[in-house]
Structure formats: C-alpha cells, structure tokens
UniProtKB/Swiss-Prot annotation:
UniProt function note: Specifically dimethylates two adjacent adenosines (A1518 and A1519) in the loop of a conserved hairpin near the 3'-end of 16S rRNA in the 30S particle. May play a critical role in biogenesis of 30S subunits.
Catalytic activity from the UniProt record: adenosine(1518)/adenosine(1519) in 16S rRNA + 4 S-adenosyl-L-methionine = N(6)-dimethyladenosine(1518)/N(6)-dimethyladenosine(1519) in 16S rRNA + 4 S-adenosyl-L-homocysteine + 4 H(+)
EC number: 2.1.1.182
Database matches in Gene3D superfamilies: Ribosomal RNA adenine dimethylase-like, domain 2 (1.10.8.100), Vaccinia Virus protein VP39 (3.40.50.150)
Name of protein: Ribosomal RNA small subunit methyltransferase A
Species for this entry: Streptococcus mutans serotype c (strain ATCC 700610 / UA159)
Amino acid sequence: MKIADKTVTRAILERHGFTFKKLFGQNFLTDTNILQKIVDTAEIDKTVNVIEIGPGIGALTEFLAENAAEVMAFEIDDRLVPILADTLRDFDNIKVVNEDILKSDLQTRIKEFANPDLPIKVVANLPYYITTPILMHLIESKIPFAEFVVMMQKEVADRISAQPSTKAYGSLSIAVQYYMTAKIAFIVPRTVFVPAPNVDSAILKMTRREQPLVQVQDEDFFFCVGKAAFVHRRKTLWNNLTSHFGKSEEVKVKLEQALEAADIKPSIRGEELTITDFARLADALREVDLK
C-alpha cells in the first residue's frame, strides 16, 4: 500500500506522534490517483532529476522516486526528517534536505545529484502562505529548471496563468509569464487532504521559455512598472503611474511622452495591457528618464 493511502497516512502519523503545525501550512495529500496524475503531468522519467519542496511524510516523494532518476526533497520541519527516513527507507535515489528552500544554496545542492547534468524539474505541494516567494525565488534563480509542476491554492494558480483583461490578471501573471509558460493542469478538491484546507487547490504546470517572452532594457524596472500599474486595480494607468512617479508638471510631461511613444492610452487600466505593452511602456519610461 502507498503512503498516501488514508489508513497508511493515519498509521504513520500516529506511530510517530506527529501533530500538524499551522506555521508550516501542512496539508498531506491522501489520493493516489491525484499523485499519479501529478507525476504524469510533470512527465517524470529516469532521464530527469527532481527537486521536491515540502515532502511531508513522503506521499508524493514515493511516486516521484519510482519514476525519476533522483529526488532531492527539501523539508523545513525537522520533525518530519525521521518520519521520511522511515517511510522512504526502501529507496536509494532520495536525498532529504532539512533546509528552508529560500535559504538553501541551490547552486551547490544540485551538484550533489549523482548525475547533475540531467534536466531538473521542480515538483511540489507548496504551503499556501509562501507559494509566491518560493516560486519567484526559483524562477529568478540562475538555475535552468526545465519545468515546474506545483500544487497551490487555486486562486494563486488562476492569477499566475491569467490573461489580460481578466479579473485574475496582474503583476504576478506578468512576473511568471515573462520567464515561463503557465497552464492549470487540473483542480484538486480540498477533501483529499489531511487536514482539509479551506480552499481547493490546482496543479499548475510551468515550462521555462528558451528566451524571456519580451526583451526589455531593464528587467527590474519592467517588473516595477508592472507592479505600479496594479496598485489600485480600478484606477487608470495614468493615476497609478502618477501615484508611483509623482505628480509634478515635469513628471506629467515625461509620462505623456512615454505613453505616446509606447502607443498606450493614459485612460486604460493596467489589466488591459499585454506583457508586450508593459515592455514597451517600461522602455519608453526609461527613455524619458523616469526610473
């Protein structure tokens, strides 16, 4: 029987006297069909290494290790390390790392794979409270992860994969889609977790683009403009930009010049702009010395 079988999960938790900590946003998946779908979605086979974040008691880790060349699982809760040593004892291709993924030296860690030259995929059931920081940390790192298949709160998955002129579209959509393609693979109901979270989850598949979606003069400034445009969603782009850059006559003249050069109407809302529009706008703002 698999670790994710509900009776097995309960027995493991009881045997080790484990209690859930809200601090770590722990929800363990107890549906083997969904775990298999995650592995299938990620297309895991012996030609790839996997980094897993938040293995819990090893339910997903077990499925990954059966299919991948090697799995490196990052677990922040040191109480789970001996449990993982127990539940995954039959595998010789799993390395459990008791570290916070945000603080880990990943460049050094990935050299510890038996074959570090294999493509690396990230597969994870991310804690809701820290999904975005972890994703952006990994995406912006210099490590060429081939793909991310990540379980997260459905609302966050909607925001990441959203298209312009939709309610969910915003600065997070821009930040991720600049580097990756993003598509929701399937929905995971809250009922298949122990304990059950308050919301449904989604599996989001993100594949790294060979080149960023658009070319910009300054990436940091491009992301900054994207954030500024959504500070007040219901306000116009002009209102958000003057709130960010200032309302002096000099600034307003420069903003008008930049918007005209980028062929963007001041009365438009941020959610109506494509990522290509934002790239033109950011470069035009730099040209008039608004940074």
